[in-house]
Swiss-Prot record:
Membrane topology of this protein: Peripheral membrane protein
Protein name (record): Methionine import ATP-binding protein MetN 1
InterPro entries: AAA+_ATPase (IPR003593), ABC_transporter-like_ATP-bd (IPR003439), ABC_transporter-like_CS (IPR017871), ACT-like_dom_sf (IPR045865), MetN_ABC (IPR041701), MetN_ABC_transporter-like (IPR050086), NIL_domain (IPR018449), P-loop_NTPase (IPR027417)
SMART domains named among the record's database cross-references: AAA, NIL
Function: Part of the ABC transporter complex MetNIQ involved in methionine import. Responsible for energy coupling to the transport system.
Alphabetical keyword list: Amino-acid transport, ATP-binding, Cell inner membrane, Cell membrane, Membrane, Nucleotide-binding, Translocase, Transport
Quaternary structure, from the entry: The complex is composed of two ATP-binding proteins (MetN), two transmembrane proteins (MetI) and a solute-binding protein (MetQ).
Gene that this polypeptide is encoded by: metN1
Amino acid sequence: MIEIRNISQRFAGPRGSVEALHNVNLSIPAGEVFGIIGRSGAGKSTLVRTINLLTRPSEGNIVVNGRDLTTLPAAQLREARREIGMIFQHFNLLSSRTVYGNVALPLELAGMKRDEIEANVLPLLELVGLTAQKDRYPAQISGGQKQRVGIARALASKPKVLLSDEATSALDPETTRSILDLLRRINRELNLTIVLITHQMDVIKQVCDRVAVLDAGRVVEEGKVIDVFLQPHHEVTRALIGDVIAQELPPAMKARVAERLKTGSGHLLRLAFTGSGVDQPILSETIRRYELDFNILHGQIDEIQGQAFGSLAVLAGGEPAKVAQALTYLREQGVVVEELSYVE
C-alpha cells in the first residue's frame, strides 16, 4: 500500500543545510493503522507530509497503491492525492460554513452535483456521529466535534489512505479516546490505511497495529506495538513508553537496590508477560521450584489492542546457579526477561 523508500529531506538553514530526514525506509500494508512517534523535532510531521508530497523529499521515492508519487506529472499527482485524506492538530474549518458545508466543500470544489454531495455527506456525518449537529457552525460545537468534522471532510473523497498529524494532541484525554475509537472503527469498516503521527505512546497503544520510532530524522526502532512495548531496544523508545509501562524504579527504592547490587546479594530483573502468561502463576511457581526470594519492586497490567500485558521489576535473591536456572525457566514460559546490572 505505502512504500517509503530511502527518503531524505534537507532544508536550508541560517548555518547551512539541515537534514530533517535521513534515509527513511518503511512499508505499510493496506488496512493497517501505522503509528510514527518521536520527540519534538524528530521529523514526524515532515515524514507524513512526504507521503502525499505536501513536502517533496530531497531524495527517495514514495509509492502509494503501486504508483510512485515522486515521478508523477502535476495532473496525475492531483488525482493520486484524492486517494489520500489528511487531518491535522488544528481543525482548519471555515467558520462561515456549517458542519455539513465544511464536509461538502471538497466535493463542491470537485464539481459534484448537489444531490450527489448530499448522498455522500449525510452518511459521513452519521459515521462520525454528527448528524444532529449538521446545521451548526464551528463556533457552536466542541473541539472533539470539530475534529470529527475534519475526519468526515478528509473521508469525503473516499480515500484509501488517511494521514493523521497530531490530530488528538489538542484534545482532552476523554475526547482523545473517543476520536481514536472512531479512527479504529473507520479503519475496520472502510478497510482504510491510517498513518498516525503522535508524540504520545498512549495513543499508539490504543489504536496502532505497528509503530516506528523516529529520532533526529532516522527510524531507530520499528515493530508490532506489543513487541515494542514489552521489549524496547532504543533509549528513545524507552523514554517514550516510560509513562505507559513503568521503566524506572521509584526513587525511594533506588538507593537500597543499588546497595544490594554492589554487594552481589541480589539480581535486578525486568519481567514482561503477555497473553495467557499475565494471569498464570508463573512467578510463584518459579519461586517454589528454584527456592528463590523475589522482592517485587513495582508492576502493572495493561492492554494493547485487546491483548493483556504485564510488567514487573523484581529483585531476585538466591544461589547464582538457581537464579540462572530460574531465568531459563521463565524464558521457556514466554516471559521476556531483562537482567539489569544497574539501577536506572
